[in-house]
């Protein structure tokens, strides 16, 4: 138990220190966070194995489900979670909340059989969407890369 507490403190410290361009990341996110359906569609299109992990979408034609309320609701859940985490970044007082959210996400997905590889695939498709649907430059890329790296450490630690 002590090891987990020390590990959590190390992750909190990592989230607190290396990335100081939270505003740049948040501004880029704000330009495209309302494209929930397109974000999830892009992920499923790039990685059908991820779609297969969603029981309500297994075996269904992506083009058909894209326009459904069920797809929109689930896409909104995912993007709302991301929005919550991104909005909390940049304030050290929020680190326990961020850790709790990300740890729970990893644990919940581990219980559903999601692997680190699939989270990496999701990240890759999501990142490609960001590049093409938001204001993107070297500063934005650096901010996203640094913050995502730290966020994924927490999620991955709870998936393994």
From Swiss-Prot:
Binding positions (heme b): 74, 109
Keyword Transport: yes
Keywords annotated in UniProt: Heme, Iron, Metal-binding, Oxygen transport, Signal, Transport
Recorded GO MF terms: heme binding; metal ion binding; oxygen binding; oxygen carrier activity
A Pfam family recorded for this sequence: Globin
Gene this protein is translated from: CTT-Y
Family stated for the protein in its record: Belongs to the globin family.
SUPFAM superfamilies in UniProt: Globin-like (SSF46458)
Transmembrane stretches, start-end: none
Protein name in UniProt: Globin CTT-Y
Cellular component, GO, one term: extracellular region
């Amino acid at each position: 138990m002590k090891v987990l507490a020390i590990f959590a403190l190390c992750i909190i410290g990592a989230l607190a220190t290396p990335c100081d361009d939270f505003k740049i990341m948040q501004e880029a996110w704000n330009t495209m966070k309302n494209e929930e359906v397109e974000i999830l569609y892009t992920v499923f299109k790039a990685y059908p194995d991820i779609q297969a992990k969603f029981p309500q979408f297994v075996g269904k034609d992506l083009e058909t489900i894209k326009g459904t309320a069920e797809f929109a609701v689930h896409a909104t859940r995912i993007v709302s979670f991301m929005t919550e985490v991104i909005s909390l970044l940049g304030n050290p007082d929020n680190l326990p909340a961020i850790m709790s959210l990300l740890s729970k996400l990893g644990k919940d997905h581990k219980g559903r059989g999601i692997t680190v590889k699939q989270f990496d695939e999701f990240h890759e498709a999501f990142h490609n969407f960001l590049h093409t649907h938001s204001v993107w430059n070297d500063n934005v890329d650096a901010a996203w890369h640094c913050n995502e790296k730290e966020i994924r450490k927490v999620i991955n630690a709870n998936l393994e």
